[in-house]
Amino acid sequence: MITYPAEFNARKEAVFTALAQVDGGGHRLRFPMLSFRDFPQTQARVVASLSRAKKQPKGRLGAALKRWLVRGQYNGARRYFLRHPDRVAVAWNGLGGSRAAFLQGARDAGAAALHAELAPFPGRITLDPVGVNAESGVPQGPEFYTDWAGQDPQRSGD
């Protein structure tokens, strides 16, 4: 069963709904899980998540509030996945901000985590346990693909 934060984008929500159906069910988190009892790794995870956040807070108050929110989300996700280690955390992109804190909380609790993203092929989605784009688990260089294609004559195409 997958667990994923609610998305306010119909396409992303449809991807998670379909994935949940294939995986035998899903738990959509309408609101972020929050906990303010820290783990030893909390501060480092918050700093890492915020350093990559798309929307950086403006001013000291905004930064403090964002740190507080991401801290609560990391701790909340970690506690949730400690209680549900059989669930798989899935988030769109998940390299920065709240989604990164969610996925890292799951990983630190021992649960599996997947990053979802549009694939380089039309109409396809990538699910990757490592990351997305240049940080994905997909080989980046052409050597892997040419070696793979060379192993079977039917794999060489136009």
What label would you give each PLM region?
Residues 1, 105-108:
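A general secondary-structure boundary signal
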